[in-house]
Every structure is written in C-alpha cells, then in structure tokens.
C-alpha cells in the first residue's frame, strides 16, 4: 500500500524510484557495469584498509586517515548501489517511507564525513610539509583519533538535522514517484505537499557550511604548502612534497567538483538526467577511483604491496 489515510490527509507510505532509465536493454548493460564497479570498489578499498593494517611502514597519520577514507568510500557506495542494482532488475522499484529516510540520512552522513576527512588529510599534509620537525608531536595518535572522531560527529550532526528535523516533518500526500535512483533531498522536497521553503533554506545552509568550512581548511592548508614548496632549494625535496600532495588534491578536486555541480550550481542550468549521471559519478565512480588515485602515485603503498605479495609468495 503506497498511501495511508490519516485524518484529512493521505500519507505516502512508500516511494517509487524511477531509476536511471526505462530501456530494458540499457538496464541490463548498466546493471553489469555498475555491479562490476561496486565489486571493484569494495575489493579495492578493503585491500587498502588491510594493507595499511598489516604493513608497519604504513602506520603513519596519512595512512590512518586514508584507511578511514576507504571505509567511508565503501559506505557511500553501499548506501545507494545495492538498491540501484535491484532497481535495474525490477520493473517497479519501491522503497518504504522509513527506508527512504534511512537512505537519505546514511548517504548524507557518509558524504559529510568524507568532507571532514579530506580536510583533516589536508591539515596532515600541511603539518608534514610546513612543520616537519613538529609533525610527530602535532599529529600524534591522540590528535589523529580526535580528528577522525570529530569527522564522524560532524557528519552525524549534519545528517541528523536533515533526516530527523526535516525529512520526518515533511508531509507527503500526493505523487510518490522519485525521479532518481535513490532518495535525495531535492526530489523529495519537490514531492512534499507541505511548505518546505524554510527547510530547504536551512538544509542548504547546513550542507553549504560543511562544504565551505572544509574547503576553507583545504585551501588554506595547500596555500601554505605551495608557498613552502616554492621556497625549497632542493629539487628532490620539491618533487617529494608535490608527490605526497598530488593524490589528495586529485581526490579533493573530483569530490568537490561533483558536489558543486549537484548542490551549488542553479538547478535550471542542467537537466534531471544530467544530475543523475553526476550523482552516479559522485556516489559510485569516485569511491572506486580513490584507491587507484592514492596507490598509483604513492611509492610507499606500492612498496608495501610488493612486500606483502612477496611474503605470500615465499610462504
């Protein structure tokens, strides 16, 4: 039952996810591609986590943050990809009202945590390049744990605001067809028959605050890093400093670039289908790419992987 009579209102009890396409052939093709991407995402990020855990030479703050980023990437992909895959197999994919709220909250929680983690990683790079003598003191285990815990708390608070205060206060009494492959705030706000203008404003402010604060930390950190690198006289030192920052800058550019497209640019400037494609890149592709970005340009990770594979071969 999709609707429930409640006094003078008809409340929606489930939503229909329209997904990416109605074309049966294209659905099969997309199912195969996205399933492969998801499996690579889980395998790649789990491998990163395990490699960091078992390799003593990777027991440094940068890799501590990277292991949590890998966990978050598995989470953000898992929050939407399984339901998307089911959507490809069914002619009519539905999600309950409660399930929609949980999916919205989990996706927002994990996305917010990733923003804070990327900012923490930028600060870690700043300390490593600009204050190498104080690095071990300033980036102690206690400080790293506090930054990670703070990232999760910040993500939880942001998600709680969106889900608890606003989603469950929305009244859905009309159409229940979401033109997306997951429960996102914008299409849900369009379906609500209650006044959501204030809610949209506050949620935009909340999401914008997370983005602006973390971007500010990243920009300031890399501004100081760039100044420090330009002052270096050693070519080898410059190359090493650049190499340690390149992978993180690439990940930051991809992540915040898609966030800007989805949540900052005016909705009139792109279609719903374009929004879906960018959302797939943001929630499905980037979690798969991050392990490749961080491992291909990192000699320590490649060295640790070779040592572990060598040990397995010898044993």
From Swiss-Prot:
Coiled coil: none annotated. It holds the Pfam family 7tm_4. Keywords: Cell membrane, Disulfide bond, G-protein coupled receptor, Glycoprotein, Membrane, Olfaction, Receptor, Sensory transduction, Transducer, Transmembrane, Transmembrane helix. It comes from the Eukaryota. Residues 50-57, 124-136, 222-241, 297-315 are cytoplasmic. The keyword Amino-acid biosynthesis does not apply. It is a multi-pass membrane protein. Potential odorant receptor. Belongs to the G-protein coupled receptor 1 family. This is Olfactory receptor 5P59. It comes from Mus musculus. The lineage of its organism: Eukaryota, Metazoa, Chordata, Craniata, Vertebrata.
